């Protein structure tokens, strides 16, 4: 049985971690043991925040829709209820975009929602 020397694989593993830690401050960028922990924590934050980003954007869209709906005399919940009754299936991302960049189109949707709520 021949002897296995680990120098090449260890160096490759260390290099991989230190490359991932590029741009970090202090010893986190050039000390393997500390960089490894920093890279692992960064990965945990990235995993968590990829999920939180979806929640945060949905909350932002709802806040924008609510603000625009109140400008035309509705609340968010009544506006969304009116759209549902009018069978208008526009997602919150598009509604928020209309609320910010195309106010007349948003007002037209609000009028349709209001008409269905009154009926």
Swiss-Prot record:
InterPro entries named among the record's database cross-references: Ribosomal_bL20, RIBOSOMAL_L20_CS, Ribosomal_protein_bL20_C
Entry GO terms, CC: ribonucleoprotein complex; ribosome
CDD domains registered for this protein in UniProt: Ribosomal_L20 (cd07026)
Disulfide bond positions: none
GO biological process, one term: translation
Entries under Gene3D superfamilies matching the protein: 6.10.160.10, Ribosomal protein L20
Tagged with keyword Transcription regulation: no
Name of a matching Pfam family: Ribosomal_L20
A molecular-function term among this protein's GO annotations: rRNA binding
Keywords assigned: Ribonucleoprotein, Ribosomal protein, RNA-binding, rRNA-binding
Domain of life where this protein originates: Bacteria
Biological role: Binds directly to 23S ribosomal RNA and is necessary for the in vitro assembly process of the 50S ribosomal subunit. It is not involved in the protein synthesizing functions of that subunit.
Protein name, entry field: Large ribosomal subunit protein bL20
Organism: Aromatoleum aromaticum (strain DSM 19018 / LMG 30748 / EbN1)
